[in-house]
């Protein structure tokens, strides 16, 4: 085990605070409508320009190990807030820095750090309750657009496109963000169930203009194994041909003789068929086939449930009003499944979401819910250059998270006003002793900091604006974009309650740990870290420079 360096009390804390300040100062310049950008160097390609707090925080790594520990702890504040609420990372960092700054002053003055922490925790609990009282539900499209606009750095087009997407696919619908190919943002809504598998042969195409296979009022055959022998398929094909309807086959794979026969039948016009591979892999594939079966009112032909392909009848097939299969995607529109069964399946998947541990699993399950329940909206971000594209895409994703948080827990006045109004709950709050009272005062001072920082980034005097806001009531606050005072809700400056709440709770949690630190242990820098110089090739006589 290598030797360690140990630092104690003020020496340890002062180094940690230096690290906290380096990270927080880099992050807080981005706060508010007049916040500035931060440019991040990349090991290859163009640098990234961002106004997203967590993106800046993630890039910061300090040389001094003790300073770096402080920076990493505050980085945890913004990461946690981003994971829980999807936005509010800069606010959380500003709050954390303020609590650490005020807390360290008190610790240096001889206060008990544990009592200070207890006082801060008490204040945060009271402030969170007050925020919940201030919160108003966010249900209409206008409020959703306003939340998205604020989160996307006052870009109204982003706020509006997110509101449109939510209106079309519902609050539960899946909204994905992709890089577009034009200069403008575009919204593409896919109704019905779409999955990322295209036709297995271009000979299935019947719409040459769109290069797609379009099947109206058709049957759907679902099979969980490979189909290579056409004899297994013949009973189904004959039944479909007699019914005079098209057929979509979804199987693990269709190859060889079976695929060739389907192509020949399609070309000759005997039966209109399209074949695609089943979506997903492994257990997820089985689950998605079952989703499609419930959506179309059919049955997955599987030996696990005692069904075989050669004995399948038309009763086992699903049906849909319309199916469109392109080279890359298949879309099933208006399946013939029973609404009760679809609803039951959605509830079942929602229960699985509650139990899921990984974010990836949750996301995939959420997609399945959306595909069964409504549809999928794709926001295609447009920009002139790749650098702008990346920055804009990050803003759209932030705004999307913020609007989801707003729908979940409601909204409060933005611009730091909600935290100032929540101070009302701390006026009469008392701790168990004097040091806890100081902890409550630290939280009170820290909760003013986001408003002060927003004003400071505008080049105005923070104390003057803060006093004016404190004298006002309700939603009265300062619009940093225009320099006017007024009702923040009416001016469309809203923050999701979940974002403000998470920022305060996470900042207090990590800051409390920092101010109660008494010793720090870090690895000693290794001597002679740089690699030894390699042996030269000696004097190569006779090879003079040209």
From Swiss-Prot:
EC number, UniProt record = 5.6.1.7
The record's section on CDD domains has: GroEL (cd03344)
Read off the InterPro entries from this record. Answer: Chaperonin_Cpn60_CS, Cpn60/GroEL, Cpn60/GroEL/TCP-1, GroEL-like_apical_dom_sf, GROEL-like_equatorial_sf, TCP-1-like_intermed_sf
A GO CC annotation recorded here is: cytoplasm
Tell me where it mainly resides. Answer: cytoplasm
Residues bound to ATP: 30-33, 51, 87-91, 415, 479-481, 495
Residue ranges of the region described as Disordered: 526-546
Query: Keywords in UniProt for this one?
Result: ATP-binding, Chaperone, Cytoplasm, Isomerase, Nucleotide-binding
Q: Which residues form the signal peptide?
A: none
Family matches, as Pfam families: Cpn60_TCP1
Location relative to the cell = Cytoplasm
Q: Which reaction does it catalyse?
A: ATP + H2O + a folded polypeptide = ADP + phosphate + an unfolded polypeptide
Q: Name one GO biological process term.
A: protein refolding
Q: Which GO terms describe its molecular function?
A: ATP binding; ATP-dependent protein folding chaperone; isomerase activity; unfolded protein binding
Per UniProt, the ranges with Gly residues bias are 533-546
What family does the entry list? Belongs to the chaperonin (HSP60) family.
Quaternary structure (record): Forms a cylinder of 14 subunits composed of two heptameric rings stacked back-to-back. Interacts with the co-chaperonin GroES.
Functional summary from the UniProt entry: Together with its co-chaperonin GroES, plays an essential role in assisting protein folding. The GroEL-GroES system forms a nano-cage that allows encapsulation of the non-native substrate proteins and provides a physical environment optimized to promote and accelerate protein folding.
Q: What is this protein called?
A: Chaperonin GroEL
Q: Which organism is it from?
A: Thioalkalivibrio sulfidiphilus (strain HL-EbGR7)
């Amino acid at each position: 085990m290598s030797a360690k360096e140990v630092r104690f009390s003020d020496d340890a804390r002062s180094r940690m605070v230096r690290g906290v300040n380096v990270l927080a100062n880099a992050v807080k310049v981005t706060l508010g409508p007049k916040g500035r950008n931060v440019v991040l160097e990349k090991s290859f390609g163009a640098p990234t320009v961002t106004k997203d707090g967590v993106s800046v925080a993630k890039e910061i790594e300090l040389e001094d190990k003790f300073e770096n520990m402080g920076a990493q702890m505050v980085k945890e504040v913004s990461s946690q807030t981003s994971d829980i609420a999807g936005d509010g990372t800069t606010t959380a960092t500003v709050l954390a820095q303020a609590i650490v700054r005020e807390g360290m002053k008190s610790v240096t003055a001889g206060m008990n750090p544990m009592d200070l922490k207890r006082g801060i925790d008490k204040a945060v609990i009271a402030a969170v309750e007050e925020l919940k009282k201030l919160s108003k539900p966010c249900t209409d499209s206008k409020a959703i657009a306003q939340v998205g606009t604020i989160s996307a750095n006052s870009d109204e087009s982003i706020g509006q496109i997110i509101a449109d997407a939510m209106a079309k696919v519902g609050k539960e619908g899946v909204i994905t963000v992709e890089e577009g190919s034009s200069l403008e943002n575009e919204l593409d809504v896919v109704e019905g169930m779409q999955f990322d598998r295209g036709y297995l042969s271009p000979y299935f195409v019947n719409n040459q203009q769109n290069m797609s296979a379009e099947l109206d009022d058709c049957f759907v055959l679902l099979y969980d194994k490979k189909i290579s022998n056409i004899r297994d398929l013949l009973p189904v094909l004959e039944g479909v041909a007699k019914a005079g309807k098209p057929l979509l086959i979804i199987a693990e794979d269709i190859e060889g003789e079976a695929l060739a026969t389907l192509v020949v039948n399609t070309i000759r016009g005997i039966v209109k068929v399209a074949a695609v591979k089943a979506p997903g892999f492994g257990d997820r594939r089985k689950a998605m086939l079952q989703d499609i079966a419930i959506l179309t009112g059919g049955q997955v032909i599987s030996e696990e449930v005692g069904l075989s392909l050669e004995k399948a009848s038309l009763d086992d097939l699903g049906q849909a009003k319309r199916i469109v299969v392109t080279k890359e995607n298949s879309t099933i529109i208006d399946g013939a499944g029973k609404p009760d069964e679809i609803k039951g399946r959605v509830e079942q998947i929602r229960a699985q979401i509650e139990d899921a541990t990984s974010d990836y699993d949750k996301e995939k399950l959420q997609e399945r819910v959306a595909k069964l329940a409504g549809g999928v909206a794709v926001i295609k971000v447009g920009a002139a250059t790749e650098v702008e594209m990346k920055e804009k895409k990050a803003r759209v994703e932030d705004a999307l998270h913020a609007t989801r948080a707003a729908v979940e827990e409601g909204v409060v006045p933005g611009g730091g006003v909600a935290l100032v109004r929540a101070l009302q709950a701390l006026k009469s709050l008392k701790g168990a002793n004097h040091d806890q009272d100081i902890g409550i005062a630290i939280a009170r001072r820290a909760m003013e900091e986001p408003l002060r920082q927003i004003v400071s980034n505008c080049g105005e005097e923070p104390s003057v604006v803060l006093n004016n806001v404190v004298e006002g009531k309700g939603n009265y606050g300062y619009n940093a974009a225009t320099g006017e005072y007024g009702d923040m809700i009416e001016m469309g400056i809203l923050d999701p309650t979940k974002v403000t709440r998470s920022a305060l709770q996470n900042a207090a949690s990590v800051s409390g740990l920092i101010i109660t630190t008494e010793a720090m242990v870090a690895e000693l820098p290794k001597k002679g870290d740089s690699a030894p110089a390699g042996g030269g090739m000696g004097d190569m006589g006779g090879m003079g420079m040209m």
